Amino acid sequence: MSKKVSKNVAKARAAVEPRPYTLQDAVPLLQQVKFAKFDETVDLTMRLGVDPRHADQMVRGTVVLPHGLGKTKKVAVITTGDRQKEAEAAGAEIVGGEELVEKIQKESWTDFDALIATPDMMRSVGRLGKVLGPRGLMPNPKTGTVTNDVAAAVKEIKAGKIEYRTDKTALVHVPVGKLSFPAEKLIDNAMTVITSVVRAKPSAAKGKYIKGITLSSTMGPGIPLDGSVADAAAKA
């Protein structure tokens, strides 16, 4: 890291006081301390009071961001027959059947942001776990990416639908837009995600569920949010 960047990082961090912020204050502050020359992604990180080693405490879900992510996702669909035409008409960039499964398997090819499959193709798609799993691309009925209604699934993803899940350390990382977005849109997207995660609380989770929330950008500092954000989400 160059001295100039180091100075910028230090200056940005110094602008964040050692206290929790409201979401309404955190977003403008993150935009104010921007120094990168590219349009950074804004990320939300939530620390949850769950033990992800237990399947009944795994938090996983999907949410459609009201203002999208500022980029169009490339969608692939594995299906057959007329549903291939439906997927293409809905805007899927990559559509195929067994030949697409074979390409992904042989070449470890994942030049797409989301993958949808129809139930009849899951026996074949199941062979792709080693390629798709580590990249978070494996279709799953719980996230709506295993479905016969491929057109609706493609449109949802194009509209800003994203998937989230806890990692091994009980953190959920979710992008909520670009730093160039108006503050109101970033706030709306962030609240939509927080509300979804709050509602996804497993019944097996005991004690405090939302242990901490941090807002950050690609190059910017992490800004801790206060408990009122989660409280508001719980009432939404």
Swiss-Prot record:
Top-level taxon of the source organism: Bacteria
Keywords: Repressor, Ribonucleoprotein, Ribosomal protein, RNA-binding, rRNA-binding, Translation regulation, tRNA-binding
Keyword Ribonucleoprotein attributed: yes
A cellular-component GO term for this protein: large ribosomal subunit
Single GO MF descriptor: structural constituent of ribosome
Database matches in InterPro entries: Ribosom_uL1_bac-type, Ribosomal_uL1, Ribosomal_uL1-like, Ribosomal_uL1/biogenesis, Ribosomal_uL1_3-a/b-sand, Ribosomal_uL1_CS
GO terms of biological process kind: regulation of translation; translation
Gene3D superfamilies found in the cross-reference section: 3.30.190.20, 3.40.50.790
PROSITE patterns: RIBOSOMAL_L1
Pfam family, one: Ribosomal_L1
Family of the protein in this entry: Belongs to the universal ribosomal protein uL1 family.
Binding partners and assembly: Part of the 50S ribosomal subunit.
Matches recorded under HAMAP family: Ribosomal_uL1_B
NCBIfam families xrefs: rplA_bact
Functional description taken from the UniProt entry: Binds directly to 23S rRNA. The L1 stalk is quite mobile in the ribosome, and is involved in E site tRNA release. Protein L1 is also a translational repressor protein, it controls the translation of the L11 operon by binding to its mRNA.
Protein name: Large ribosomal subunit protein uL1
Organism field: Acidobacterium capsulatum (strain ATCC 51196 / DSM 11244 / BCRC 80197 / JCM 7670 / NBRC 15755 / NCIMB 13165 / 161)
